[in-house]
């Protein structure tokens, strides 16, 4: 079920109901596809794309979000290209990542030292869970970021800030131990922190862990502890479970770190699963991460730019166990599938056929939805799902909200291959949530 929720969030499509569903219907000639009329476009190619469609209004934002579908290869290249571009044009050096605070710490250690065993720590829980994140292309991108970082002056070097809820409790234990070595906490707080460390290292998560973290945070001496230590303790108190709760936890982390890390004057960028970057609520009214920012009182409000990847003809790497039998690669932990594109068979984004007519096979094309003459400033996003798909697994955009109020740019990715899975021996010990 966790994989199902993940793919609903990231790919706008479910898995398990396929045997009961027929393909999503293609648009009929009588159905207008005006949502993308008048939308300017730019081909994105090469190692250093110009991104000429980005105007000064775009660069004036503080937070830049790229929405992708995990398991597709080309977004990894786009992420690196966009990070480099924003570093050069907007001074972005803080990558707000879809990882937790512990993984962000070890990512920064890798950027500092280049030690591949440190990178192994980051990937071990993803590999143990047969996660789409455990792939060679993501790891290669991190290696490229480090090599590029070495060429930058200190004032422009990239660092990671993890906004997600805790993903790997043993790694959180290692992180806590590193924090305690770096900055000794107030003496009265040490016994409780030692107990937290012991619980984090247990084979199964203890239900008492959250309460212990709350008691540590309530200690009068905790204000003298490092901000990183307090942030880790806060994360241990968060309830885990549903995707809705996760969105709330991610936003809570941003709000806390925005103050603790003094990010008011920092430009921020990150690549996230595509549903996280939607700036308006869906029909059910529940706000995603970006929508929560827009509804908040943070100085970031109304200073967010979302760029959303949509896919045609692409292959996605998925855990084999989560796929219907006809899609599975027998005997393999991962399988590649082309069923999660946005022009069918499971979901159809109305207007995508028009955009495909304006682009070439194998291309990547940027479209500006908030251009003054674009119909997407007035017309909503419309998705059609295959018959038989449970409503609970559908993402329904509000018909009263224009497309540009959800995202300001689209990146149409055509005919990308899947990411390549890491071999099982690529990392060491197994992580645990």
Model-derived features with residue positions:
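Bacterial N-terminal signal peptides that target proteins for export
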Residues: 2-11
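Compositional signal for N-terminal targeting/processing segments
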Residues: 24-433
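Generic intrinsically disordered, low-complexity segments enriched for polar/acidic and small residues
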Residues: 13-14, 33
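Hydrophobic h-region of N-terminal signal peptides that target proteins for export
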Residues: 14-23
């Amino acid at each position: 079920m966790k994989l199902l929720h993940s793919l609903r969030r990231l790919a706008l499509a479910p898995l398990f109901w396929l045997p009961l569903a027929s393909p999503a219907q293609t648009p009929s000639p009588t159905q207008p596809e005006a949502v993308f009329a008048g939308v300017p476009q730019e081909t994105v190619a090469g190692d250093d794309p110009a991104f000429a469609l980005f105007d000064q209004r775009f660069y004036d934002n503080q937070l830049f979000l790229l929405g992708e579908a995990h398991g597709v290869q080309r977004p990894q290249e786009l992420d690196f290209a966009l990070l480099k571009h924003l570093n050069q044009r907007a001074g972005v050096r803080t990558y707000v990542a879809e990882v937790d605070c512990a993984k962000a710490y070890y990512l920064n250690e890798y950027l500092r030292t280049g030690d591949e065993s440190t990178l192994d720590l980051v990937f071990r829980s993803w590999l143990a869970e047969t996660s789409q994140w455990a792939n060679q292309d993501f790891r290669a991108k991190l290696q490229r970021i480090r090599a590029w970082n070495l060429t930058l002056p200190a004032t422009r070097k990239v660092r990671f800030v993890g906004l997600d809820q805790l993903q790997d409790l043993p790694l959180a234990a290692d992180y806590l131990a590193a924090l305690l070595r770096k900055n000794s906490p107030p003496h009265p707080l040490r016994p409780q922190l030692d107990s937290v460390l012991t619980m984090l290292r247990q084979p199964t998560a203890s239900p008492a862990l959250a309460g212990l973290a709350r008691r540590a945070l309530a200690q009068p001496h905790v204000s003298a502890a490092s901000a990183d230590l307090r942030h880790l303790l806060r994360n241990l108190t968060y309830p885990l479970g549903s995707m809705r709760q996760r969105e709330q936890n991610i936003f809570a982390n941003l709000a806390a770190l925005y103050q603790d890390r003094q990010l008011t004057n920092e430009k921020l960028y990150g690549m996230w699963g595509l549903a996280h970057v939607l700036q308006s609520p869906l029909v059910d009214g529940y706000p995603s991460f970006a929508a929560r920012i827009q509804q908040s009182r943070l100085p970031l409000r109304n200073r967010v730019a979302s760029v959303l990847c949509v896919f045609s003809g692409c292959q996605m790497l998925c855990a084999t166990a989560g796929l219907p039998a006809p899609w599975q690669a027998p005997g393999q932990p991962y399988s590649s599938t082309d069923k999660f594109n946005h022009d069918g068979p499971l979901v159809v984004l109305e207007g995508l056929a028009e955009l495909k007519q304006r682009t070439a096979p194998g291309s990547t094309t940027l479209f500006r939805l908030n251009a003054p003459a674009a119909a997407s400033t007035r017309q909503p996003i419309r998705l059609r799902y295959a018959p038989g798909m449970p409503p609970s697994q559908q993402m329904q955009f509000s018909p009263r909200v224009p497309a540009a109020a959800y995202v300001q740019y689209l990146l149409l990715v055509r005919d990308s291959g899947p990411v390549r899975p890491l071999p099982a021996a690529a990392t060491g010990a197994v992580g645990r949530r």
